[in-house]
Structure formats: C-alpha cells, structure tokens
C-alpha cells in the first residue's frame, strides 16, 4: 500500500486552497497562480508518484509551488519528465510521461524553451477574469486526469485491504487499488467545486470513469462488471435491467432468459446495478457448468 507522501499531502491542501480562492477571489491571487495550482496540482506529477510508488526528489517542485513560481514549477516538471523516461521498471510510467507531455507541451525538450510553453503563453496574453482561467485550467486538468483508458490496472499492485475503508468507499465487495480511492475522493471535490452539480451526479460520473480499475487483485482476474459485458458480447445477449423496485426497496434485477441477477442498495443505484451484474455472472457460469 502506498503511504501518503508529503507531496500528496501538500497537493490536497493546495487543491483545497485553490478552490477557496476561486470561490472567494482576491486581488492578491494572480491569474497564473490559480491556473498553475489547479492545472499542475490536481492533475500532474503526484498521480505518477501514487500510481507506481516511484521515489524521486520533489523538493524543488514543492518549493516552486509554495512560492507560486510558475517558471520554476515548469522547470521541475521538465526535469522529472526526463527522469521518468529513463526508468523502464514501471510500465505505468509511460502513462505518467504522457500526462506530463500534455501539461508542459510535447515540443518542450529544453529548459530554455520554457517561454514557448502554451500554458505561459496563454496566461501572458489572455486578459480575462482569474475565475474563468482557473475553471478552464481545471477542465483541462480533469480531462487529462480522467483519460485513464491507457492505464493498465494489472500494473497497479497496491490494494486497499482495509475492509472498513473498502466498505466506506462503496466499491461493492471487491479490492480497490489505493490510488483509485484517492483519485475518487479528490476528483469528487474538484469536480463539485468546478461544476456545482448535485454531489450524487458528480459521484456517479467519477465512479463510471474509475470503475475499470476495480479488480480482485489476482493476476488475470476480471471484475464482474467487465465479465458481464464480455458474456453479453460473446453470447450476443441483451439482458433486461429492471429498475422499477429500486425506489421502494432498493433492488434492481437483471434478467436474460432463465438467468437472473439481483442487487440491493437503497442509497446508490450504481452499486445495486453492479451487484446485480455480479450475481448474473455467477448464475450464468453455474448454468453453463451444469450444462456441460
């Protein structure tokens, strides 16, 4: 399990601080400060650190953040990106390098080219409110952060084994990589601040994006949700999902022929559906085994 690093703790505090600044803007908060903090702190390097447990000196990066120095922050990111490129031990780092490329520009290969970085150029030339700039940076950051389709969950070995914490996260009864729970909680916060949507809608959106990273921890294991999709595709099945009793007793039923799956969760429809899929998969496998 990955321990919470000083960098991660600082990140969470800065994200909270930035959200406060967006809500209560002051003249002392420069445009680049808001955009820089949201873009880099809610998206960037700490994601890589948490995903792979990669040890790296981040003191210069932290110092540049504390001083609100965008140029030094970019220099540190360039240096860290170059170091990550040299490490082949963690396949997930390829994904991390891609994140940094998105943040600092693909053509940014030398420190003396920093002034050409699109982030700096936009912040220097744009003349609009800091709230708008901050929110746009957050949207870009969330887009990069949530684009996790290339991240291979098989390389994420850090599982959340604390049953109490696992149940609190409502990820059904399956192991959850520690990084997923961290991302889940953080992203709910920043997305809620940015959109003002109902918190339940925000939770559902985040869960849908991160669900594929939930797995049992055994090599080659597929979550029941993934297995459900595979079974339906391979066997050309079109199960019927019945929601009509969810508002009364929290139950959702999935039917396909004589195979039925039922899930119950009175507070979260998504989790009731997932449990119904899990039971459907179990019953479908049992039926096929009996027919062999």
Curated annotation (Swiss-Prot):
> How does this chain sit within the bilayer?
Single-pass membrane protein
Which superkingdom, per the lineage? Viruses
- Looking at the UniProt record for this protein, which Gene Ontology cellular component terms does it annotate, in alphabetical order? host cell endoplasmic reticulum membrane; membrane
Q: Where is this region: RNA-binding?
A: 219-292
- Quick check: keyword Transmembrane helix in the entry? yes
* Compartments in which it is found: Host endoplasmic reticulum membrane
Query: What keywords does the record list, in alphabetical order?
Result: Host endoplasmic reticulum, Host membrane, Membrane, RNA-binding, Transmembrane, Transmembrane helix
**GO MF:** RNA binding
- TM annotation in the entry: 29-46
Q: What are the boundaries of the signal sequence? A: none
Q: What does this protein do?
A: Acts as a ssRNA-binding protein that may be involved in targeting RNA2 to replication sites or facilitating RNA2 replication.
Indicate what this protein is called per its UniProt record. RNA-binding P34 protein
What organism does the record attribute this protein to? Lettuce infectious yellows virus (isolate United States/92)
């Amino acid at each position: 399990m990955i321990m919470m690093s000083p960098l991660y703790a600082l990140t969470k505090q800065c994200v909270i601080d930035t959200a406060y600044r967006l809500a209560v803007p002051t003249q002392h908060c420069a445009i680049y400060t808001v955009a820089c903090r949201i873009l880099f702190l809610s998206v960037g390097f700490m994601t890589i650190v948490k995903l792979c447990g990669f040890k790296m000196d981040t003191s210069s990066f932290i110092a540049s953040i504390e001083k609100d120095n965008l140029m030094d922050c970019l220099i540190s990111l360039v240096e860290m990106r170059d170091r990550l490129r040299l490490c082949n031990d963690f396949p997930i780092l390829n994904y991390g390098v891609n994140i940094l490329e998105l943040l600092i520009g693909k053509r940014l290969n030398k420190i003396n080219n920093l002034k050409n970085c699109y982030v700096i150029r936009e912040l220097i030339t744009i003349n609009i409110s800091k709230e708008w700039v901050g929110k746009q940076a957050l949207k870009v950051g969330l887009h990069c952060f949530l684009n996790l389709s290339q991240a291979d969950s098989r390389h994420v070995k850090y599982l959340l084994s604390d049953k109490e914490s696992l149940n609190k996260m409502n990820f059904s009864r399956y192991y959850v990589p520690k990084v997923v729970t961290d991302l889940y909680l953080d992203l709910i916060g920043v997305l809620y601040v940015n959109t003002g949507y109902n918190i339940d809608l925000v939770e559902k959106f985040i869960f849908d994006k991160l669900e594929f990273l939930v797995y049992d921890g055994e090599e080659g294991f597929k979550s029941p949700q993934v297995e459900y999709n595979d079974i339906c595709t391979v066997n050309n099945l079109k199960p019927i999902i019945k929601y009509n009793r969810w508002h009364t007793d929290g139950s959702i039923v999935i039917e396909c022929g004589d195979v039925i799956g039922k899930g119950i969760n009175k507070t979260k429809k998504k989790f009731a559906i997932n449990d119904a899929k899990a039971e459907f998969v179990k019953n479908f496998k049992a039926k096929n085994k009996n027919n062999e």
